[in-house]
UniProtKB/Swiss-Prot annotation:
Protein name (database record): Adenylosuccinate synthetase
Entries under SUPFAM superfamilies matching the protein: P-loop containing nucleoside triphosphate hydrolases
Cellular component terms per the entry's GO annotation: cytoplasm
Signal peptide positions on this chain: none
Subunit architecture: Homodimer.
Length: 428
């Protein structure tokens, strides 16, 4: 058995879904442990794309059970729509393979409206997806949240809605002056959705615990990336949950269960959606080339992703924050056949050179130390025996600076275009 965590090691959009989908072939459970439908995973199988936002990437494997842990904030409208959309394409989803924690905090219409009006009424944009993620986590922490199980009980749901709406009603009416659903309108919608989705409600804590005790393979699938972690990330330009490995313990299982592998999913370059510092960002034709070739458009937001060279000081920081055991490098093919190829190995900052970022650093004030790398070309299926020499040098540069090995290499969009240097699953 193996307990494997997939963590985004950058600002999200690293290709976690692709790696999770590939590992799910040998997994018994694939578990989402934080975030919400602000995540967007793209899977490509036989040339066909599947887009996921809430449901774990194991859904394409019939034997794999998918779990949404209690650390996820759940939009029941989005979950219902995603299930319906996937079922329409022939993907089997039922109470036999999808288990949603009864303790997930629910995202309501009020959370989404509050998210939108806040972003539109501030001069300092965060770049929120507008999905209501932050306000839902606020209610969770302030003990005003609505849990998934509350949707099934009329009296409890109405009571929890009244608590949640009380403060927001004043904001909507007096501060933002926007229309909002009445309590009864929201109640009717949520209760109806609760009846429809109740079949998926489960004690996921025990499901995961029992699977581990039975020696099953469990893959924990993170959303976003370490650099968006509410504690470790580039605050305030972060998400509202713990996207690092810490989120596994707070959002799915207990610290009593050890983790065999913590894989940091990393693009061969760097991207970011929304606002915030980005030391290696490219504003020239090279950046536009990477953007176009890499198809760098957000699955959830439809926004163009900012692109830049691979940032090793930030990657090393992510590795430390999540105790990464290895790196899964993705989108290597995007850098193939480039005229110019660079990587950031350090920063000049406040009169000194540093080679690993840290929480208090002001990334707006760093000057990246860029080194020129020899361009490489990928024109065929990549095996351990035919990796181009220049690519080997690129990989070794990453390993030497970050201090952990690269355990897999993705060089195309399909699940077949991954070269594994390590078997994550224990034998026997």
């Amino acid at each position: 058995m193996s307990n494997i965590v997939i963590v985004g090691a950058q600002w999200g959009d690293e290709g976690k879904g692709k790696i999770a989908d590939t590992l799910a072939e040998k997994a018994d459970l694939v578990v989402r442990y934080q975030g919400g439908n602000n995540a967007g995973h793209t899977l490509v199988v036989n040339g066909k794309k599947t887009f996921l936002h809430l449901i774990p990437s194991g859904v394409l494997h019939q034997h794999t059970k998918c779990v949404i842990g209690h650390g996820v904030v759940l939009d029941p409208v989005a979950l219902d729509e995603e299930i319906t959309r996937l079922q329409a394409t022939g993907i089997a989803i039922s109470a036999e393979n999808l288990f949603v924690s009864e303790s997930c905090t629910i995202i309501t219409s009020y959370h989404k409206l509050l998210d939108a009006v806040r972003e539109s009424n501030t001069s300092e944009k965060i770049g929120t997806t507008g999905k209501g993620i932050g306000p839902a986590y606020e209610d969770k922490v302030s003990r005003k949240g609505i849990k998934f199980k509350h949707l099934f009980d009329k009296d409890v749901l109405r009571s929890r809605l009244a608590i949640s709406l009380a403060e927001k009603e004043t904001l909507f009416r007096d501060l933002y002056k926007v229309e909002y659903p009445t309590l009864e309108q929201e109640f009717d919608k949520l209760f109806a959705l609760g009846q429809k989705l109740k079949q998926y409600a489960a004690d996921t804590f025990s499901i995961i615990d029992q699977a581990i005790a039975a020696g099953k393979n469990v893959v924990y699938e993170g959303a976003q990336g370490v650099l968006l972690d509410v504690d470790y990330g580039t605050y305030p330009f972060v998400t509202s949950s713990n996207t690092s490995v810490a989120g596994v313990y707070s959002g799915a299982t207990t610290a009593g269960h050890g983790l065999d592998h913590v894989i940091g999913i990393t693009k061969a370059y760097t991207t970011r959606v929304g606002e915030g510092p980005f030391p290696t960002e490219l504003f020239d034709d090279v950046g536009k080339f990477i953007q176009h070739k890499g198809g760098e458009i957000g699955v959830t937001t439809g926004r163009i992703r900012r692109c830049g060279w691979l940032d090793l000081p930030l990657l090393k920081y992510s590795a430390k924050c999540s105790n990464l055991t290895s790196i899964a490098l993705t989108k290597v093919d995007v850098l193939s056949d480039m005229d110019t190829l660079k990587v950031c190995i350090g920063y000049k900052y406040e009169g000194r050179e540093i080679y690993c970022a840290y929480p208090g650093i002001d990334l707006y004030k760093v000057e990246p130390i860029l080194v020129e790398m020899e361009p490489f070309s990928i024109n065929e299926t990549v095996t351990k025996d035919n990796i181009p020499a220049a690519l080997k040098t690129y990989l070794k540069t990453i390993e030497n600076h970050v201090g952990i090995p690269i355990s897999s290499l993705a060089y195309g969009p399909s699940r077949e275009q991954i070269l594994f240097f390590e078997d994550y699953f224990k034998k026997g």
